[in-house]
C-alpha cells in the first residue's frame, strides 16, 4: 500500500465544527495507463477529482474499531484523470478535493475526545496517495503532505448522530476557498 508513505494532514488550529476541504492540484505530462487513489480519514470523506465524485461509497471509510484499525479504500480513478498530451507542451491539470466530515470517530462526547463541549471536535485528519502509471511504464506517487491546501467548506457542522449546518452565503468553493492554507503535517505517531 502506497498510503503508508503518505503523511496524515490536517487544518492548523482545527478544533472546530467546520468541515475542511483538502485540495491538491497536479499535472500529468504524458498519457496515463492507470491511476488509483488510496484514502482514509478520521471522519467520513467524499473525494472529487476534476469535478466528478470518486467512487460510490457513502460515509466512507465506514465504521471500525478505531483503537485497532482504520479502513482504507482504493479507487480506480483512471477515467477521471485528465491525461497528458504528448503533442502539447502543457501538462494536463487535475484537481483532487477531499472533504472530511465528522463521522463515528470524530463525534462529540466520544470516549476518546478530550472535551465535553459539544461544539468541539477532534481535528479532521486525512491520509491519501495517488498512484499514476504512465503508458511508458514510469510511475508517480502523489501522497498527502505539506503541498496540499486546506480550506473551510460551507458545511459548518456535520455528524452521524446530529444535524448538519450549511452556510452557503460563505461562497466557498474550489475557485474561491475560504481561508485557504497549507495543510499541516501531523507529526505524532498514529497507532493503527
Role assignments for model-derived ranges:
Residues 1-13:
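Boundary/junction segments of secreted and surface-exposed precursor proteins
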Residues 5, 34, 91, 179-182:
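Residue-level detector of intrinsically disordered, flexible termini
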Residues 11-17, 21-168:
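Accessory beta-strand-rich segments of carbohydrate-active enzymes
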Residues 178-192:
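Edge strands and adjacent loops of beta-rich recognition modules
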Amino acid at each position: 500500500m502506497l498510503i503508508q508513505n503518505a503523511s496524515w494532514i490536517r487544518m492548523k488550529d482545527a478544533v472546530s465544527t467546520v468541515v475542511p476541504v483538502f485540495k491538491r492540484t497536479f499535472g500529468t505530462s504524458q498519457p496515463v495507463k492507470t491511476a488509483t487513489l488510496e484514502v482514509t480519514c478520521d471522519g467520513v470523506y467524499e473525494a472529487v477529482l476534476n469535478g466528478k465524485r470518486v467512487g460510490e461509497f457513502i460515509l466512507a471509510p465506514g465504521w471500525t474499531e478505531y483503537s485497532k484499525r482504520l479502513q482504507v479504500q482504493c479507487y480506480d480513478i483512471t477515467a477521471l484523470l485528465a491525461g497528458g498530451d504528448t503533442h502539447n507542451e502543457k501538462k494536463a491539470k487535475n484537481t483532487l478535493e477531499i472533504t472530511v466530515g465528522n463521522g463515528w470517530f470524530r463525534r462529540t462526547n466520544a470516549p476518546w475526545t478530550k472535551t465535553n463541549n459539544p461544539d468541539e471536535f477532534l481535528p479532521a485528519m486525512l491520509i491519501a496517495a495517488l498512484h499514476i502509471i504512465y503508458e511508458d511504464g514510469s510511475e508517480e506517487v502523489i501522497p498527502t503532505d505539506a503541498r496540499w491546501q486546506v480550506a473551510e467548506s460551507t458545511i459548518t457542522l456535520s455528524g452521524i448522530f446530529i444535524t448538519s449546518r450549511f452556510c452557503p452565503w460563505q461562497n466557498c468553493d474550489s475557485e474561491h476557498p475560504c481561508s485557504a492554507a497549507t495543510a499541516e503535517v501531523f507529526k505524532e505517531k498514529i497507532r493503527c
